[in-house]
Amino acid sequence: MNLNFMPLLHAYNHASIDFHFNSSARDFCVHEVPLYEFSNTGEHAVIQVRKSGLSTLEMLQVFSQILGVRIAELGYAGLKDKNALTTQFVSLPKKYAPLLEKNTHNLQERNLKILSLNYHHNKIKLGHLKGNRFFMRFKKMTPLNAQKTEQVLEQIVQFGMPNYFGSQRFGKFNDNHQEGLKILQNQTKFAHQKLNAFLISSYQSYLFNSLLSKRLEISKIISAFSLKENLEFFKQKNLSVDSNTLKTLKNQAHPFKILEGDVMCHYPYGKFFDALELEKESERFLKKEVVPTGLLDGKKALYAKNLSFEIEKEFRHNLLSSHAKTLGSRRFFWVFAENVTSQYIKEKAQFELGFYLPKGSYASALLKEIKHEKGENNDEF
């Protein structure tokens, strides 16, 4: 497989929308929504922290330096952007809580502010969040482009959007996935096991994005072409699909088509199950009750069946499925932005956007779907 970055298809077919977005503390805000309410009792202090100009890992290092707490004793639910104003929850042993107020000034000098203090009986672990609320400010936006943006948002609210991994997953030079494959091939290795695991996960993410883009391509072809043309297309791809199945696929109202054998999942969380009754599952998908999932390959990954598997297998790698420390999983192909709010400020030529996404989903994926950056070919089947 070609490991160079290829344009990823969009869900919707509008032309590129021209505006400026700067990922900065003024124009990009991220607020973590916790998975559960904190009990206000227990051996772990839980602080809500506001930061800017620091990555989550850099923030943890600051806490370690100022409070004397070991980084391993600190708990957090997820990584937050460096170039943004972000809030997130961090847990630390209760004994360090009195030091927080004493070091308020020292923390503020490092762009950290404690917004609240609570207590809980367990340490916060990775993944212990519901999702994130986002705010983005777009600049140099004309009234016409603001109108176009509103129209795209209406589609996203109605149908959702592709759940692509964001570019930050792949590093400054977009080569993390290549390093991950080299680790699997025993061509390179780093001293820190967490770094090795992260780079391997970047390769998983690259395969997932590529599979999702391929599925969007197939969905667009099913929608755009006649039954006869579709039969010829699937025949050329050595994919076995009969005319009755194709009719069912064309009748699906959602732009992302559910295929026989897809691994579905209840949304926003729940159990996996196989898509066997396509008409029924496509209706539930429209209602945002279930979502098809894509492969994050690994030793214990759950694989699709039938037609879905025939497409998915091109995005597997035997080194992932045999790697002892890479268990594998599945990820929503599609997510739904919630609580979407927008405002166009004509005199400033600015467009303000707020929305909520479930954990693991990227604001940059929504930005990509709105903007349709020039040079990204969305019509190439």
Curated annotation (Swiss-Prot):
Gene Ontology molecular function: any one: tRNA pseudouridine(13) synthase activity
Keywords, ordered alphabetically: Isomerase, tRNA processing
GO cellular component: cytosol
Swiss-Prot/TrEMBL catalytic activity: uridine(13) in tRNA = pseudouridine(13) in tRNA
Positions annotated as active site in the UniProt record: D81 (nucleophile)
EC number: 5.4.99.27
Pfam families found in the cross-reference section: TruD
All copies of domain TRUD, residue ranges: 160-335
InterPro entries: PsdUridine_synth_cat_dom_sf, PsdUridine_synth_TruD, PsdUridine_synth_TruD_CS, PsdUridine_synth_TruD_insert, TruD_catalytic, TruD_pseudoU_synthase
GO biological process terms on file: tRNA pseudouridine synthesis
Function: Responsible for synthesis of pseudouridine from uracil-13 in transfer RNAs.
Family affiliation: Belongs to the pseudouridine synthase TruD family.
Protein name: tRNA pseudouridine synthase D
Protein's gene: truD
